[in-house]
Amino acid sequence: KDAFLAIEDAEKLQITLNNETVCNEINGWYVDKSIKTVSLPEIKKGLNELIVKLPFGKRTNTEWCYILGDFGVKTEGCFSTIIEPNTHVGFSSLTNQGLPFYGGNVSYKTNIHTPDCYAIICANYFRGALIKVLVDGEEKGIIAFAPYRLKIDEMTKGNHTIEFILYGNRINTFGGMHNISQPKWVGPNFWRSEGDQWCYEYILKDTGILASPIIEIYENSTNK
């Protein structure tokens, strides 16, 4: 429950969910202000039917719509199923952890015990814009470019929480996920594949921190 539908021109559409009329009163927007959100009735367990009616002609461009809410998604071939949300993720692709279409930021936390030291963090295998690193809630820097290392000065003896905030991208949210050729360029025709260059299955890109960051500890007594 408490889900939203994000869609362009929402106020001009006729929308029903399981034969129940959806009030198209705008209550927000998603990513871009042209993609507006409306509240959906409760989504029931099992098969649900969402119908969107709009005036359609030769010059009409239809765009994707998005169901937003506190839930996870499982993709299998051509099908996607809403599942319980995954509140804990590991260092691997988010597409296999209930977040195949997620394009926002993700926070990873790990606890360590250190002596008085400095540390070097290496996170060289991720798919996103950059990683922000925090120690005990204090921002220490970002990892974005090779060699993907960050020095943390003056860590005191004791327990610390290291947080990695991955800034995501929208490749699995707005990208051409049915384009078999997967070209390296992006333009209008990237979303217009047809024939044997189009498939019903989702062709997803890995996102997230894909391998555990390495934390190197150097005791201050050895760094004279």
Locations of the language-model features?
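Glycine/proline-rich low-complexity spacer/linker segments in large multi-domain proteins
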Residues: V22, P55-E84, Y167-I217
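Aromatic-lined ligand-binding clefts that engage carbohydrates, nucleic acids, or primary amines
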Residues: K1-N19, L50, N111-G137, I143-A144, ...
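A short, structured loop/turn motif at beta-sheet edges
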Residues: L40-L47, T75-F79, D116, I152-T161, ...
